[in-house]
Swiss-Prot record:
Keyword hit for Ribonucleoprotein: yes
Protein name: Small ribosomal subunit protein eS6
Family classification: Belongs to the eukaryotic ribosomal protein eS6 family.
Keywords carried by this UniProt record: Ribonucleoprotein, Ribosomal protein
Stretches the record annotates as Disordered: 114-137
A Pfam short name: Ribosomal_S6e
Bias (Acidic residues) ranges: 114-127
Entry GO CC: ribonucleoprotein complex; ribosome
Biased composition (Basic and acidic residues): 128-137
Coiled-coil ranges from the UniProt annotation: none
Any one Gene Ontology BP term: translation
Entry superkingdom: Archaea
Length: 137
């Protein structure tokens, strides 16, 4: 059974997260990074483009590794390598570009604008003020 946490970003820079479980997550299995899919999977109208992700242990997906396997790759720049000096190469563990059941987080681009969700009213500050008034009396 696949469980995915999907982070969706739109062209304006806004993002949102959705949790997909079991049969809702099945349409994403087997897709590769860079492919587009229908956004109705997450309840939106439009297209989603897969841009990245990571597995349950935090190993990032990399576009140039084919399949869903984990491999040690010699890197000099790119995804999964930060602050490499000039000429330095590092062997790191990376995940392939195919979505499988071991993937936990998937990053996507949405071709339209995400719907604006209003933040719930905060009741906590009001209740704190009431408590302080009760103590003064």
């Amino acid at each position: 059974m696949a469980n995915f946490k999907i982070t969706i970003s739109d062209t304006k820079g806004k993002s949102m997260s959705k949790e997909l479980k079991d049969s809702d997550a099945n349409p994403l299995l087997g897709l590769e990074l860079g492919q587009e899919t229908d956004a109705s999977v997450v309840g939106l109208n439009g297209k989603l483009k897969l841009t990245g992700g990571s597995d349950k242990s935090g190993v990032p997906m990399r576009n140039d590794i084919h399949g869903a396997a984990r491999k040690y790759v010699l890197l000099s720049k790119g995804v999964g390598l930060q602050d490499a000096e000039k000429g330095q190469r590092v062997r790191k563990l990376m995940r392939g570009n195919t979505v499988s059941e071991e993937i936990y987080q998937i990053n996507c681009k949405f071709d339209g604008e995400l719907p604006v969700e209003e933040a719930p009213a905060e009741d906590a500050p009001e209740s704190a003020e009431e408590k302080s008034e009760d103590k003064k009396e």
